[in-house]
Amino acid sequence: MVEPREQFFQDLLSAVDQQMDTVKNDIKDIMKEKTSFMVSFENFIERYDTMEKNIQDLQNKYEEMAANLMTVMTDTKIQLGAIIAQLEILMINGTPLPAKKTTIKEAMPLPSSNTNNEQTSPPTSGKTSETPKKNPTNAMFFTRSEWASSDTFREKFLTPEIQAILDEQFANKTGIERLHAEGLYMWRSQFSDEQKKMVKEMMKK
């Protein structure tokens, strides 16, 4: 027979072994959970880095798009100003202007050396010579400040009646903003259907 004292120690050792096995299993489970957590955390960090990079890329693209939009808007304003200036001249003269670059100095008429003399030339093909209609300077090559404020420009291309109407309608506007408003007003109120049709045909070419 086993002595009670020896049996007690055997039972105690057996219980300790069982507890150690339980602790070892718990430690294994904890390590597995830790490994799983670390993998999940690393995946989260990787996804976060990817998301942060995507956000930065989107921000860069947005800034690039904004810069491109500002460039397009600036170019559009300049082109619109040129078109409106051409429309104003077309309304006065009724014919499109040749695309010839001229300066303000060239645009000013030179005094005639002899107003009494007339230039004569022999008629050709039995047709009587006629004085050609003088085309004004192509306003497309005036600067924006000249379009909007030049007295020479206004006197050369706008009648006094139209100048008075525009001054009254758009006294609170200046610069390119006023030019656009004047052009739109003249297109809507001053252009005939025939002139509008002519402009649309010209812009299709």
Curated annotation (Swiss-Prot):
One of its GO terms (biological process) is symbiont-mediated activation of host autophagy. It comes from the Viruses. It is found in: Host cytoplasm. Keywords: Activation of host autophagy by virus, Coiled coil, Early protein, Host cytoplasm, Host-virus interaction. Residues 108-141 are annotated as: Disordered. Residues 111-141 have a biased composition (Polar residues). One of its GO terms (cellular component) is host cell cytoplasm. Induction: Expressed in the early phase of the viral replicative cycle. Residues 10-75 form a coiled coil. Induces host endoplasmic reticulum stress and consequently activates autophagy and NF-kappa-B signaling pathway. In turn, may induce autophagy-mediated STING1 degradation and innate immune evasion. Belongs to the asfivirus K205R family. This is Uncharacterized protein K205R. It comes from African swine fever virus (isolate Warthog/Namibia/Wart80/1980) (ASFV).
